[in-house]
Amino acid sequence: MITLSHYLVVAALMFVLGLIGIMKRNNLIMLFFSSEILLNAANVALAAISKFYNDITGQIFALFIVAVAASEVAVGLGLLILWYKKTGSIELSSMNNMRD
């Protein structure tokens, strides 16, 4: 039987994977993907805790996180497309020249 600790271990592994992706990548698209993995890890944890304690509050928070993540992707990718058109690069190091 799958217990709450199994879900929390999966959520923790997803969270660590997202943190490693944020720390190790220089590509802005990969940074977006890593931040989405972080948010999905929080969703898994909230939904699992909510199910095992028979409280719908965690699932409602997970729904709000999905909405925030969707808006983050829409705004972030729009800005990323504009940045690519301006500089021709999506590497993180190209953002050092934003003041110019």
Swiss-Prot record:
It is found in: Cell inner membrane. It catalyses: a quinone + NADH + 5 H(+)(in) = a quinol + NAD(+) + 4 H(+)(out). InterPro entries: NADH_UbQ_OxRdtase_chain4L/K, NUOK/Mnh_C1-like. The chain crosses the membrane at residues 2-22, 29-49, 63-83. One of its GO terms (cellular component) is NADH dehydrogenase complex. GO terms for molecular function: NADH:ubiquinone reductase (non-electrogenic) activity; quinone binding. Its EC number is 7.1.1.-. GO terms for biological process: ATP synthesis coupled electron transport. It is a multi-pass membrane protein. Keywords: Cell inner membrane, Cell membrane, Membrane, NAD, Quinone, Translocase, Transmembrane, Transmembrane helix, Transport, Ubiquinone. Pfam families: Oxidored_q2. The keyword NAD applies. NDH-1 shuttles electrons from NADH, via FMN and iron-sulfur (Fe-S) centers, to quinones in the respiratory chain. The immediate electron acceptor for the enzyme in this species is believed to be ubiquinone. Couples the redox reaction to proton translocation (for every two electrons transferred, four hydrogen ions are translocated across the cytoplasmic membrane), and thus conserves the redox energy in a proton gradient. PANTHER family: NADH DEHYDROGENASE SUBUNIT 4L-RELATED (PTHR11434:SF21), NADH-UBIQUINONE OXIDOREDUCTASE SUBUNIT ND4L (PTHR11434). NDH-1 is composed of 14 different subunits. Subunits NuoA, H, J, K, L, M, N constitute the membrane sector of the complex. Belongs to the complex I subunit 4L family. NCBIfam families: PRK05715.1-2, PRK05715.1-5. This is NADH-quinone oxidoreductase subunit K. It comes from Campylobacter curvus (strain 525.92). The gene is nuoK.
